[in-house]
Regions:
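Glycine-rich beta-strand-centered segment in the early N-terminal region that forms part
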Residues: 23-41, 53-96
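NAD(P)H dinucleotide-binding glycine-rich loop of Rossmann-like/cofactor-binding domains
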Residues: 63, 68-69, 76, 89-153
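Short glycine-centered segments of the SAM/dcSAM-binding site in methyltransferase folds
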Residues: 89, 146, 170, 236-237, ...
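Short amphipathic alpha-helix with an adjacent loop that forms part of the alpha/beta core around
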Residues: 200-210
Length: 327
């Protein structure tokens, strides 16, 4: 059958993406075909579009169908698939999602509860699973924990603030403007630092009685990473989970020595590779989403053909909620 897909034939800016009609084979054994209903737009997509193949973003042959996650309805099943049936609502973390239809291994699907809408799942599945392992497994936050989150008003920042507060942690967020500060305050943050007008190192130390944060979640990268080392507590952890401002360059490992700082550069792929862990992570996420325990604001909705504009908006850093594409 034919499917429409947003592809790149060369790496570059948003303008390199184009809507193509391509052939999609019938689902192979163990696979299903999904009619995508809502597609998440994430920074991983920008890294792929630009050709940044560091870390988990391995190089692919061109042309590339864009995208790393979506939700939809199973349209066809391949041989030996017994876990899912036609008509079931599912989400997935996987390639080629900027398309009207996608084939995926049945073993990598997440069944969506009725209480979680397609838009919420599309906006929060990847971000939510990332937040789950960052807050509940990589570093277990809870009462007595002080966490600092960079880009607190962004899509990841909002769910980290909400879920961190739910777990009992004290949440400090950094933002670039007073408008974003207001957004972050409404989503679980106990203190907000506007780094455009104040020194976030000094302010973090002030907020923590000079001790530093227990854990710092950095999705910014180049602009924030080294400064984060100066405001984490001794034996604390700096988690570099994203590089929105550019990759972190080489740095002297001795900078970690005086405070025994732990630095990690994790990827979601490693934390949901085990099926049992993936199932437990999705259950935890869907419990907080469907139970109304956290707010789930949504940003702009773009038609699939306007994927380039969605990328421009995400890269503008003006976004304070997840962006999705609607096929």
């Amino acid at each position: 059958m034919k499917t429409q897909a947003v592809r790149i034939h060369r790496h570059g800016g948003p303008e390199v993406m184009q809507l193509d009609e391509i052939d999609l084979p019938e689902p192979a054994a163990g696979h299903v075909r999904i009619r995508n209903t809502c597609i998440g737009v994430n920074y991983a997509d920008i890294y792929e579009r630009e050709g940044d193949h560091g870390g988990p973003h391995s190089a692919k042959d061109l042309p590339i169908t864009m995208g790393h996650m979506a939700v939809g309805v199973i349209d066809a099943v391949g041989k030996d698939v017994t876990s899912h049936t036609i008509g079931a609502r599912v989400g997935y973390i996987g390639p080629n999602s900027y398309a009207t239809y996608t084939n995926m291994p049945a073993a990598r699907l997440f069944s969506l509860p009725d209480a979680v809408t397609d838009d919420v799942a599309g906006g929060y599945l990847l971000r939510g699973l990332t937040a789950e392992y960052l807050l509940r497994r990589l570093y277990r936050v809870g009462p007595g924990t002080t966490a600092l989150v960079h880009a607190a008003a962004g899509g990841m920042g909002l769910i980290l603030g909400e879920w961190g507060r739910l777990l009992g942690a004290r949440m400090i967020g950094t933002v670039s403007s007073e408008a974003k500060a207001e957004v972050a305050r409404a989503h679980g943050y106990d203190a907000i630092i506007n780094y455009s007008s104040e020194d976030f190192i000094a302010r973090t130390l002030q907020e923590t009685d000079g001790k530093g944060a227990d854990v710092i979640y950095d999705g910014v990268g180049k602009m924030a990473f080294l400064k984060s080392l100066d405001c984490v507590r001794p034996r604390g952890m700096v988690v570099s989970y994203g590089t929105a401002s550019g990759n972190v360059g080489e740095f002297d490992l001795q900078r970690l020595h005086s405070k025994s700082i732990i630095v990690t550069r994790p990827t979601l792929r490693s934390w949901i590779a085990d099926p049992d862990e993936a199932a437990a992570a999705s259950k935890a996420l869907f419990d907080v989403l469907s139970g109304g325990k956290i707010q789930t604001p949504l940003g702009a909705r773009f038609p699939l053909a306007q994927a380039a504009e969605a990328h421009r908006q995400l890269e503008s850093r003006s976004v304070t909620a997840p962006i999705v594409l609607i096929p």
